[in-house]
Amino acid sequence: GLVIRHLPRHDEAVLRRCEAAGVATLHEAWDRQGLMGPAIRPIQQGVSRAGNAVTVLVTPGDNWMFHVAVEQCRAGDILVVAPTSPCGDGFFGDLLATSLQSRGVVGLVGDIGIRDSQTLR
């Protein structure tokens, strides 16, 4: 896989304004582009986050690049995980959540299977 180590970062003030505006407002402001599919749902309701996105493309059944992406994350980031094909594998659980939390990552968005959801809540 390809790893980009020096990611462009947005200004903290811009991120805070985005967080305050909310998803629906941002979606409208960006000509209704970039909204995730309706099957991607939060496991924790009522939480709003904005941060720099660290993106990773994963192959179902292989979480190596997921771990590589975690190493690229900084405090305030959001990890965005997309599989190369439909995947219900439990890629993410409490162990990776602890790793992200120790790096200060504020969220994860993914079209992937999540395990340990009760613990993560």
Task: Report each predicted region and the residues it spans.
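Feature captures the catalytic cores and cofactor-binding loops of soluble hydro-lyases/lyases
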Residues: 1-121
